[in-house]
Amino acid sequence: MRLALFDLDNTLLAGDSDHSWGEWLCQRGLVDAAEYQARNDAFYADYVAGKLDVLAYQAFTQAILGRTEMAQLETWHRQFMQEVIEPIVLAKGEALLAEHRAAGDRLVIITATNRFVTGPIAERLGVETLIATECEMRDGRYTGQTFDVPCFQGGKVVRLQRWLDENGLDLEGASFYSDSLNDLPLLEKVSRPVAVDPDPRLRAEAEKRGWPIISLR
């Protein structure tokens, strides 16, 4: 069985679910909009530039999880899915998932965005295996802290390798689809790296290395 690995944000989605979640919270008046938006945008700019402090970012994004009851978070997320995520699910991305599924490949979404945000999205896309940044839980609610290695840059390789070892799998014949140079460590590990609507830095790298470049837009 070959693996088909997919980044989520700006790969299978026409946008960034993590950043969009923050924008949705601001629009709903659930956080201090001016302060939150400024920090959210600054972190996103750092991500695009490849210099994100992932632990600081996760502390920022998960703070609201730690101070909100689970039932309320689930209600908000259902609204977020309907209002924000559904319109940015890419039909060509779903077709690509279906193509790999029909070929008998094991589908995996591997994303830096936390599991609270991405779990329902992976379910919506019909992908059972999700490797994401983990949110610590205690007594049935989020603590607001990150648990385990953040699934970002080299952390994606660490988290994936652990999952491979636990499941007796390897990367022989594996594909990985991503839009971002932040995913270069994992792109270099697979048999078939594919740049999807890549950012300028990944496009240059893919062209230099002769990697396929595709668009799902």
Curated annotation (Swiss-Prot):
Binding site for Mg(2+): D7, D9, D179
Molecular function in Gene Ontology: hydrolase activity; metal ion binding
Cofactor notes: Binds 1 Mg(2+) ion per subunit.
Active site residues per record: D7 (nucleophile), D9 (proton donor)
One GO-annotated biological process of the protein: L-histidine biosynthetic process
Keywords: Amino-acid biosynthesis, Histidine biosynthesis, Hydrolase, Magnesium, Metal-binding
SUPFAM superfamilies per record: HAD-like (SSF56784)
Phenotype of gene-disrupted mutants: Inactivation of the gene results in growth defects and incomplete auxotrophy of the mutant due to a deficiency in histidine synthesis. The growth defect of the mutant is rescued by expressing hisN from C.glutamicum.
Residue ranges crossing the lipid bilayer per the database entry: none
Associated pathway: Amino-acid biosynthesis; L-histidine biosynthesis; L-histidine from 5-phospho-alpha-D-ribose 1-diphosphate: step 8/9
InterPro entries xref list: HAD-like_SerB, HAD-like_sf, HAD_hydro_SerB1, HAD_sf
Record has Magnesium as a keyword: yes
Reactions listed under catalytic activity: L-histidinol phosphate + H2O = L-histidinol + phosphate
Amino-acid biosynthesis keyword on record: yes
PANTHER family: PHOSPHATASE RV3661-RELATED, PHOSPHOSERINE PHOSPHATASE
Family: Belongs to the HAD-like hydrolase superfamily. SerB family.
Biological function: Catalyzes the dephosphorylation of histidinol-phosphate to histidinol, the direct precursor of histidine.
Protein name: Histidinol-phosphatase
Species: Pseudomonas aeruginosa (strain ATCC 15692 / DSM 22644 / CIP 104116 / JCM 14847 / LMG 12228 / 1C / PRS 101 / PAO1)
